Amino acid sequence: MPVKLAAGGRVKQNLTITPETQLLDEVTIVSTGVSRIKRSAFNAVAVDTKELQNTTKNLSDALTKAPGMKLREAGGVGSDMQLMLDGFSGKHVKVFIDGVPQEGVGSSFGLNNIPVSFADRIEVYKGVVPVGFGTDAIGGVINIVTGKKPRRWFLDASYSYGSFNTHKSYVNLGQTFKNGFTYEINAFQNYSDNDYHVDAPVKNFETGSFNESEKYRVKRFNDTYHNEAVVAKAGLVDKSWADRLMFGFTYSHMYKEIQTGVRQKTVFGEKHRRGHALMPSMEYSKRNLMTKGLDLVLTANYNRNATTNVDTARYEYNWRGEKHPLNSPGEQSHQYSRANSDNWNGTLTLNYRIDKAQTLTFNHVLNTFRRDNTSLLAAQEQKDPIAKETRKNISGLSYRLMPSERWNFSAFGKYYRQYVAGPIAETETSSNFIRTSRTVDSWGYGAAGTYFLLPGLQAKLSYEKAYRLPTIEEMFGDEDLESGDVGIRPENSDNLNLNLSYSKALGKHSIYVEGGVVYRNTKDYIQRNIQDLSGGKEGATYINYGKVLTKGYTVSARYGLGRWLSAGGNFTQMNVRDNEKTQIGTGGATENIGYKSRVPNVPYRFADFDVNLYWHDLGKKGNVLSVTYDNQYMHSFSYYSQAVGKNSDFIVPDQFSHNLALSYSLNRGRYSFSLECRNFTDEDLYDNFSLQKAGRAFYGKVRIHFGD
């Protein structure tokens, strides 16, 4: 607020500065989150989302800006998605929002559904994970950081429309009152017909012939997707007894038609899935709790997730949309079932600053899960007699020493414990199931250090003996296309990172270069395998494969020129190899013919590059025109192990795609208009074998932003 001062007069003004804090393993530092991540001892990067908020990108798209990160989607909007980080993908990489684990929240609230405006930044920790997250990731952690700084009032709203009848909208509004009461509401939706063209074999129902090598240009016809979500929070901030006390409620809904199986040759015409999730939550934080230097963060949430799978069609479909009667109902497996999942999660983080140089952090995470399945096919609902349950406890303690800004060091230990209960067949050939349960526990440990060799030249070294407990899907399946194994064992890995980065500003010029090498020696590696089912159908299952050795490196660079140019990119090379010398079968131990060969179905070389141009005060002071070009390259890789041959029919080909975006913002960002063309050279794109993504697509977006 401006202060009027008469000539010769004096006035006393009290100012209160509210710092942004993160209670992980780091000392609480008054700085931006991006700079805090860069100076930490861990192999981590922070992606600032502000430059992307005028685009139609979602959070998963933004993550591709991080070195070593690869996004793998099975199709269009709402399709199944995996994030790959330094050779690890899917369940190896854990997702958090503001430090809270997102296990069990359901697909309606996935990263590929959440608009990029939802987050201030995205933190990516690679391989070695700080104790403060309390997780069992061996691949890394993705932490979505939202804005928590109290704001007097604000409104951010956007709508976009594009190819394949795609609609996306987003509203974020909130207010903080003088008495400390604050509220915030996030709401968003996505809709798409996903009716893009693909090249696929077509079954001839008259002759019954099916030639997989003969492809036709066909249009997807059973792939409509929509989801809606509302996240509401209210509470108090800046009180003597609480820095932040918030109560929240999240509701999300999803409807998804299922066009293909695990390969594109399998096509469905009526199969679909729908679901919803309800999640109340609580968050409490207090600095200097009872004594100076002791900080506390508590979070808790409960998630009720209901998913209904419908596969009751009496017809078989081909890629032209033609249908043929089936002998028995069900395109994949005759089902009309509902899975109700209950997921409880609680976290406790204590951060104690012993002195200016030393910090202790304790973290504990409790997660419980229960799923009940009910068949709706019969006139009366039939509930499975054996529920599927897990209970997971992870505790961690770390010590951090930071005697100067030039170097710091952290050492930590973790304890993992998991209880699992669920159905298992009485014998290998039996259709009768009994309840089984087991408990596993493990100890992990690690250390991380960083040192500034010269101003702007930073070295990092980190190591962790890490464990990953099996996920719900790996133990129990997804109740549809995937089956699990309740007896699957935890993975363990020796993870080592070495990084070197350099940054320099020379007048209007700025450069940033970073390179890193990774080493992962993983045992009991959990692998997703495709298996043939009866009737020519296919599904997926999970197994403990054995030992896998990962070696690789990433390189990233960025150049800036004043306020009008930014250009940079990333290159990743990962060598993920089968490291199991023998394999155990019914006849005993035999030589593993795949020893030292590449692990199949894993991209191992990829890169991206972008150029951003800005024209400030174009047309009027405060207006900005920006033009962005970016591309993505992925080298070809094999769907099957190289040890069983190099059949070109099972190769995901080389790909090089290009995108272009134009954005014009007025009145210092209050109003924004943007146009995008994705894949403007109309390349055939695949992230997974035979599952083709969309070709050239156009999108437009309008956005308004008011308030602080």
Where do the PLM segments sit?
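Short, acidic, small-residue-rich periplasmic hinge/interaction motif at the N-terminus
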Residues: 6-53, 60
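Extracytoplasmic beta-strand/coil segments of soluble accessory domains associated
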Residues: 44, 60-101
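Short acidic/polar hinge/loop motifs at secondary-structure boundaries
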Residues: 100-127
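Outer-membrane beta-barrel translocator/receptor signature
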Residues: 104, 118-120, 131-143, 148-199, ...
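Periplasmic-side early beta-strands and strand-to-turn transitions of outer-membrane beta-barrels
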Residues: 151, 160, 177-263
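Face-selective signature of the C-terminal outer-membrane beta-barrel domain
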Residues: 231-254, 273-429, 434-458, 462-464, ...
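Membrane-embedded beta-barrel scaffold of Gram-negative outer-membrane proteins
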Residues: 452, 459-464, 468, 491-551, ...
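Gram-negative outer-membrane beta-barrel transporters
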Residues: 512-521, 541-638
